């Protein structure tokens, strides 16, 4: 059913959803902060940032143009070079998922419903309404959102990706899409993407990537930070000022590398080391990672598009001219991607095996949101791969609702105990 806005029903839906979002977020953050007991001061910035964003407290007026993105496959360097600021719309909120469900089929993925609910209820908490939403053709459900009649007044831009990434034809197609995107961005923002602006944007994002890769490296060693906290740090990149985010990740890394503090919420060095993969955990939907670490497991790495895949891979530029920088950007966003929207997708197998070796992983937890067919379809292949490698895997199908907590708790506890018995 279409709910045109503004009207009284829209006002009630929007107000109620935003209030429940604050309650959800505060509940998760209070739990995380209680577990950490303030022993890692560097995390306070990220806790506060997530809390403030959920409450809409970061949305102070400025003259910047904001462009929303719905997927990790958007080359954000081009958005910065065009004089705008990217903000990710992907949401982990159950209340926003319920708002989005007003429009979507009952079996839609929670992430897609929550993303649409966030956009529709004007809960992208940035200083000014985004001038566009960039929507790559990755997820089958997300790419149809622009066609839903909901009275939305933010224009969608469809960024076309090929269904495969290994063929020469696919790469040529994607290069063409990225070039077209760069030209269209200039029309959206009214600012030309010059060589100097694009170089500065690539270097700006590269500094953030370098800080994140250092955090990733620190997590390979003995437990110093909970995996749930590391995922939160990555999630805040969605909407934080990039320079401020990079500075605070650098400070956190220094603190962790010095070994000055240890989070009491982290299990001992003999705790089972867990790798997370599948449908991404996005704040405040930390149901699964919080449970895993509460049960005595330690999340040492993840393969989520909302955290590790968001920032790990960098742009490799040979020469700082437009003829090299744009193809280099296209390469970074296509060739490094392990999203199941691509077929074949053996790169994902190789990446998971690399994580298992580098992070000394004891077990893999594979999360699939109900309705997320892409990750569900790949689960059997990944399960067979884990069996060959003698790595136990727990497959979990869930959504944003808290109703299955009891059942999940029982299964996760049994899985952690079985991993402990193997050590």
Residue ranges and their predicted role:
Residues 72-73, 78-92, 99-100, 279-344, ...:
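Redox- and metal-dependent alpha/beta enzyme cores, enriched for Fe-S-associated oxidoreductases
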Residues 117-184:
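Acidic/His-rich segments in extracytoplasmic proteins that coordinate ligands and/or metal ions
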Residues 70, 275-277, 367:
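Short hydrophobic segments within beta-strands
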Residues 130, 356, 360-366:
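Proline-aspartate-enriched helix->loop->beta-strand connector
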Residues 383, 387, 393-423:
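C-terminal regions of proteins
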Residues 2-65, 179, 183-312, 341:
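A charged, amphipathic alpha-helical module
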Residues 16-28, 33-121, 125:
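Generic N-terminal leader/targeting and pre-domain segments
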Residues 119, 343-360, 377-378:
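A short, acidic, amphipathic alpha-helical segment used as a generic capping/interface helix at domain edges
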């Amino acid at each position: 059913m279409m709910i045109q806005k503004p009207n009284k029903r829209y006002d009630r839906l929007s107000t109620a959803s935003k209030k429940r979002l604050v309650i959800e977020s505060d509940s998760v953050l209070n739990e995380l902060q209680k577990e950490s007991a303030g022993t890692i001061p560097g995390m306070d910035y990220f806790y506060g940032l997530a809390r403030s964003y959920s409450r809409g407290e970061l949305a102070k007026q400025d003259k910047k143009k904001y462009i929303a993105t719905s997927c990790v496959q958007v080359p954000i360097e081009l958005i910065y070079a065009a004089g705008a600021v990217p903000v990710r719309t992907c949401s982990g909120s159950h209340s926003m998922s319920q708002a989005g469900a007003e429009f979507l089929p009952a079996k839609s993925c929670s992430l897609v419903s929550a993303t649409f609910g966030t956009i529709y209820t004007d809960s992208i908490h940035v200083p000014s309404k985004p001038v566009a939403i960039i929507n790559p053709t990755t997820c089958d459900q997300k790419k149809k959102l622009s066609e839903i009649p909901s009275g939305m007044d933010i224009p969608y831009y469809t960024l076309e990706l090929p269904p495969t990434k290994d063929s020469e034809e696919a790469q040529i197609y994607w290069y063409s899409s990225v070039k077209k995107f760069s030209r269209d961005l200039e029309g959206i923002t009214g600012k030309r993407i010059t060589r100097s602006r694009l170089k500065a944007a690539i270097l700006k994002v590269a500094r953030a990537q370098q800080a994140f890769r250092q955090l990733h490296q620190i997590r390979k060693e003995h437990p110093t930070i909970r995996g749930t906290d590391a995922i939160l740090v990555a999630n805040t990149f969605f909407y934080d000022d990039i320079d401020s985010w990079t500075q605070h990740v650098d400070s956190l890394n220094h603190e962790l590398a010095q070994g000055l503090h240890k989070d009491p919420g982290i299990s001992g060095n003999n705790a089972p080391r867990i790798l997370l993969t599948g449908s991404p955990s996005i704040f405040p939907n930390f149901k699964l990672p919080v449970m895993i670490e509460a049960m005595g497991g330690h999340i040492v790495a993840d393969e989520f598009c909302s955290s590790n895949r968001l920032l790990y891979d960098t742009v490799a530029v040979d020469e700082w001219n437009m003829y090299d920088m744009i193809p280099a950007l296209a390469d970074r966003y296509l060739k490094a991607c392990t999203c199941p929207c691509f077929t074949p997708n053996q790169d994902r197998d190789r990446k998971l095996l690399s994580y298992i070796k580098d992070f000394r992983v004891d077990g893999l937890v594979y999360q699939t949101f109900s309705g997320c067919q892409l990750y569900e379809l790949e689960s059997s292949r990944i399960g067979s791969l884990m069996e060959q490698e003698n790595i136990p895997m727990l497959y979990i199908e869930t959504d944003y609702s808290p109703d299955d907590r009891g059942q999940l708790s029982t299964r996760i506890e049994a899985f952690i105990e079985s991993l402990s018995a193997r050590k």
